From Swiss-Prot:
The keyword Secreted does not apply. This is Photosystem II reaction center protein M. One of its GO terms (cellular component) is photosystem II. Its main location: plastid. It comes from Arabidopsis thaliana (Mouse-ear cress). InterPro entries: PSII_PsbM, PSII_PsbM_sf. The gene is psbM.
Amino acid sequence: MEVNILAFIATALFILVPTAFLLIIYVKTVSQND
């Protein structure tokens, strides 16, 4: 069970980190367009 939890956390971070990075770029782009 512990291994599954760690794998879930690792997967969540692997998905959330790039997503957050893309969102930051998107927000900056929209702000520049205004």
